[in-house]
A protein has these predicted regions:
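Polyanion-binding surfaces on beta-sheet-dominated domains and ring/shell assemblies
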Residues: 2-83, 87-125
Length: 125
């Protein structure tokens, strides 16, 4: 399914680790577990993720892919905790992170920041 207002589509083929439930932003950004979110949240997340990934890719030797996996944990009627696992592949090297937060946007932002920091730390070492 292609959304003409953005470059987001749901992958319909099972390739590598991609499932039919994955959302792809362009060719290099894969989101898993984000399917049940409302449209307004997804608009904000797409902008936020796109901007941060652009900064990350500028620091990469050869940016390949970034994958974010969202899980809801410790869900109660009053609140929920969002777990975001991130995986960045740069020139064959893998960088991983895991963040848990009560705020979805903060969880995604922190996961991307941690990947960015890990990449910079490795490049300067």
């Amino acid at each position: 399914v292609i959304n003409k207002n953005s470059e987001v589509y749901v992958a319909m083929e099972n390739k590598e680790k991609n499932t039919s439930e994955d959302i792809k932003l362009g060719e290099q950004i894969i989101l898993s577990g984000f399917q049940g979110l409302d449209g307004g949240s997804m608009v904000i997340l797409r902008k936020m993720i796109g901007n941060e990934v652009r900064k990350i890719s500028d620091k990469c030797e050869q940016f390949e892919t970034i994958r974010l996996v969202l899980k809801k944990t410790h869900q109660t009627e009053a609140s929920e905790v969002f777990e975001v696992n991130g995986n960045l592949t740069d020139n064959g090297k893998h960088f991983n992170t895991k963040v848990e937060e009560r705020n979805l946007f903060l969880a995604v932002s922190k996961a991307l920041e941690k990947l960015h920091h890990e990449l910079e730390h490795t490049r300067h070492a």
